[in-house]
C-alpha cells in the first residue's frame, strides 16, 4: 500500500508542489513570466479593462484586482482544465468586443495554439485602445503539449514580424532564459522519460530507489546548478520563451 501511494505521488509530482524559493531556483522561467504579468498590472490604471486572451483556468486573475479583468478562451486546449472562471467563450480570431475597448491585453503562451496567429494579433490591435499595451509570451523551446492544438514555436524575429505586420510598435522583447536554464528545464523531464512509461509494477518497484535518486539529481540538484550559471550565456539563443510588450 505504501509503495503504491509513493508511485502514485511520483507520477503526479509537480514543481508547483515545492516551496516557492526552491521552485524559483528550479524553474526561474515561470517566475519571470509572472513578474512580466505583474508589470502589466502595475502599468494598467485602476478600473481599466484588461483582456486575458486564451485565459484557460485564469491563473493570472489575481494580478488584476484593481482592474476590470475579462477572461476569454475557446476552452478546447486541455480536457482536464476547469474553464468555469471564463467570462467569455470565444475564438480569438473573432473577438466579440467593440473596437478600442481594452487598456491592456495579456496573451500568455497562447499563440502557439492558434492556427492563424496573425489574425489573432490583428484582433488584439482592433480591440485595444490607442496607446494601449499588449503583453505576450511565446515559446521558442518547448515540448509538444495540448495536442492536437499545438501548431507553432516562435523566434524573436518571428513574433516581431507578426506584431509589426499588425501595426503594433514593439516596446520591448526579452528572452526568459539562456542555454543553461534551457538545459535545466529539459533535464527535469528525464525521470518521467525513464520511469513513467514502465507498465510493470514489479519492475517499477525494483527501480524505485533509482527513480528517487533521479528526482533528486535531475529535478532538484542539477537544474539548480545550471540555473545559477545561466548568466554566463550572453546570447540567449536557446531561450525557453520570449516576453514581448507592444503598443498600439
Cite the ranges covered by each PLM segment:
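Generic secretory/membrane-interface signal
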Residues: 14-17, 46, 85, 179
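Acidic/proline-rich low-complexity IDRs
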Residues: 2-6, 14-17, 50, 91, ...
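Class I SAM-dependent methyltransferase Rossmann-like catalytic core
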Residues: 1-44
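Conserved short-loop catalytic and cofactor-binding motifs
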Residues: 21, 25, 108, 146-147
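Aromatic-acidic/polar surface patches that form glycan- and anion
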Residues: 22, 26-33, 113, 152, ...
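Conserved SAM-binding loop
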Residues: 38-145, 157-160, 244-246
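S-adenosyl-L-methionine-dependent methyltransferase catalytic module, highlighting the catalytic core
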Residues: 118-119, 123, 129, 133-247
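A generic structural signal for ordered alpha-helices
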Residues: 11-19, 75, 83, 137, ...
Amino acid at each position: 500500500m505504501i509503495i503504491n501511494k509513493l508511485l502514485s505521488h511520483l507520477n503526479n509530482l509537480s514543481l508547483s508542489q515545492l516551496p516557492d524559493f526552491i521552485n524559483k531556483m528550479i524553474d526561474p522561467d515561470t517566475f519571470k513570466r509572472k513578474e512580466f504579468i505583474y508589470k502589466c498590472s502595475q502599468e494598467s490604471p485602476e478600473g481599466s479593462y484588461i483582456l486575458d486572451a486564451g485565459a484557460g483556468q485564469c491563473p493570472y486573475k489575481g494580478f488584476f484586482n484593481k482592474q476590470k479583468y475579462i477572461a476569454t478562451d475557446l476552452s478546447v486546449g486541455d480536457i482536464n482544465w476547469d474553464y468555469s472562471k471564463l467570462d467569455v467563450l470565444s475564438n480569438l480570431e473573432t473577438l466579440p468586443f467593440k473596437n478600442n475597448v481594452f487598456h491592456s491585453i495579456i496573451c500568455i503562451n497562447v499563440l502557439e495554439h492558434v492556427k492563424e496567429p496573425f489574425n489573432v494579433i490583428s484582433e488584439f490591435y482592433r480591440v485595444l485602445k490607442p496607446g494601449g499595451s499588449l503583453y505576450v509570451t511565446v515559446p521558442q523551446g518547448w515540448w509538444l503539449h495540448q495536442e492536437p492544438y499545438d501548431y507553432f514555436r516562435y523566434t524573436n524575429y518571428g513574433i516581431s514580424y507578426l506584431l509589426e505586420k499588425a501595426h503594433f510598435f514593439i516596446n520591448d522583447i526579452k528572452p526568459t532564459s539562456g542555454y543553461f536554464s534551457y538545459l535545466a528545464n529539459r533535464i527535469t523531464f528525464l525521470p518521467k522519460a525513464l520511469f513513467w512509461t514502465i507498465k510493470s509494477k514489479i519492475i517499477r518497484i525494483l527501480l524505485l530507489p533509482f527513480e528517487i535518486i533521479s528526482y533528486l539529481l535531475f529535478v532538484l540538484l542539477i537544474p539548480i546548478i545550471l540555473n545559477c550559471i545561466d548568466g554566463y550565456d550572453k546570447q540567449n539563443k536557446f531561450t525557453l520563451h520570449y516576453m514581448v510588450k507592444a503598443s498600439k
